[in-house]
């Protein structure tokens, strides 16, 4: 849940999730609809699907235990080097370091070398004798991430009171590296076409064409092409939406129709027991006034 999402946002979701699924086995018996409904509003829904698949695999193939082999762990859906090392360190107390953005920044500043010029795997291997003196490897994994997040912050790090400033080349140097990452923002224009029936329901389908909204329930959605718009569609509103590094400029069109196109289902504009992503909810709110 914490991947790409702030702690304060995650806390209520985490509490509800762990209250509902108290064991790996109970989670493995769930399904996409239930998991996504509980995840609704957190975004990055692939995480939820991967978590469910991981639970099923661990229960079925590993007797509800996390493997000790990094090769086996990386076979789990959505698990790469970072997550695998974090799991081995936190769960099995192995001498591992989970290299996330906070840890990279911490090491990079300590050496006063830009991240792009550091091979972090080689750096850890070279310094493993000093790094892994402790037997509390799980604490080390978490401490490095927390230190980078709370002390060695991206902007305005509090270097004067930092316990590492005696060895930190960033602190001592007059020529400091720049650790601020500029996000590459992409602008995209889309037209969304909403079919609404007399019962105040909207026709939605599972999208498999727009990559950043894959598997979401959406109305018809296409890249903007004013010339191709049928006259039966009425323009409702233009609005902006942001998803990750994308800025979307959206034209919303609608028409009243009781005819349901193939592979579409009716969803209420007001309340849905099934999972509806935030992106689609914004559309529903704009249509309620019709």
What does each model-identified segment do?
Residues 2-160, 164-167, 173:
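Catalytic cores of DNA base-excision repair glycosylases
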Residues 146-290:
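Intrinsically disordered, low-complexity, charged terminal extensions of DNA damage-control enzymes
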